Amino acid sequence: MMSKLGVLLTVCPLLFPLTALPPDGDQPADRPAERMQDDISSDEHPLFDKRQNCCNGGCSSKWCRDHARCCGR
């Protein structure tokens, strides 16, 4: 009896993984407009220099690399 239950508990997740289920509507990936509002804008970021329109932090900073050019370049 226990071995049958073990086989059932092993086979069911393999046949029907949870990723096969459709996500519900509350997922952030379904709402890109709200996801964009959560990002900090260039004007508010502490490493962004508004006068020179560039990032005054280290060029290796992930935010600077992704959003603005470095002032040192």
Swiss-Prot record:
State how changing H67A affects the protein, per the record: Most important decrease of affinity to both Nav1.2/SCN2A and Nav1.4/SCN4A
Q: Where is the composition biased (Basic and acidic residues)?
A: 28-40
Propeptide intervals in chain numbering: 21-49
Give an example GO cellular component term for this record: extracellular region
Q: What is the effect of changing D66K?
A: Decrease of affinity to both Nav1.2/SCN2A and Nav1.4/SCN4A
Q: Which UniProt keywords apply?
A: Amidation, Cleavage on pair of basic residues, Disulfide bond, Ion channel impairing toxin, Neurotoxin, Pyrrolidone carboxylic acid, Secreted, Signal, Toxin, Voltage-gated sodium channel impairing toxin
Q: What is the effect of changing H67D?
A: 100,000- and 400-fold decrease in affinity to Nav1.2/SCN2A and Nav1.4/SCN4A, respectively
Which residues are annotated with the PTM Pyrrolidone carboxylic acid?
Answer: Q52
Name the Gene Ontology molecular function terms of this record.
sodium channel inhibitor activity; toxin activity
User: Impact of changing D66A on the protein?
Assistant: 10-fold increase of affinity at Nav1.2/SCN2A without affecting Nav1.4/SCN4A affinity. 30-fold decrease of affinity to Nav1.4/SCN4A without affecting Nav1.2/SCN2A affinity
The entry's stated outcome for K62A is: 6-fold decrease of affinity to both Nav1.2/SCN2A and Nav1.4/SCN4A
Keyword Ribonucleoprotein attached: no
Q: What is the effect of changing H67R?
A: 30-fold decrease of affinity at Nav1.4/SCN4A without affecting Nav1.2/SCN2A affinity
| Broad class of the protein's primary localization | secreted
Region listing for Disordered, in residue ranges: 20-40
Subcellular compartments: Secreted
Assigned protein family: Belongs to the conotoxin M superfamily.
**Domain free text:** The cysteine framework is III (CC-C-C-CC).
Tell me, what does this protein do in biology?
A: Mu-conotoxins block voltage-gated sodium channels (Nav). This toxin moderately blocks rNav1.1/SCN1A, rNav1.2/SCN2A, rNav1.3/SCN3A, rNav1.4/SCN4A, and mNav1.6/SCN8A.
Further information = Negative results: does not inhibit Nav1.5/SCN5A, Nav1.7/SCN9A and Nav1.8/SCN10A.
Tell me the protein's name. Mu-conotoxin SIIIA
Q: Which organism is it from?
A: Conus striatus (Striated cone)
